[in-house]
């Protein structure tokens, strides 16, 4: 078995807990696509964010309109997944639903 470098590199957040575009609050799940974009379920901020490779801040791709049950809101997203048609799905935990989005970044 090979050796590992045990020094991590911050690829999203890392600027303390908060709701600015360069911060996360209770991230719970990530997905990394073929372009090395990192998608983060950011439960404490009720949003899903996309961090492009080497970005200093993320882009809100779902939620981000406060905690709530409207279609443009999330309540503690805890997971996400993608299909092969360009849609992504968010586990909207405390709204007891799965939301589907077409991503266009």
Protein language model regions, located:
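Conserved blade-register residue in beta-propeller folds
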Residues: 1-2, 50, 100
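Gly/Pro-rich loop segments of beta-rich domains
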Residues: 3-28, 54-78, 105
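Residue-level detector of Asp-centered blade-edge/turn motifs that repeat once per structural unit
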Residues: 32-35, 82-85
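Conserved beta-propeller blade signature
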Residues: 38-39, 88-89
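Conserved strand-to-loop turn within each blade of WD40 beta-propeller repeats
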Residues: 42-44, 92-94
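Structural signal for beta-propeller blades
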Residues: 46-49, 96-98
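Long terminal segments
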Residues: 85, 93, 100-105
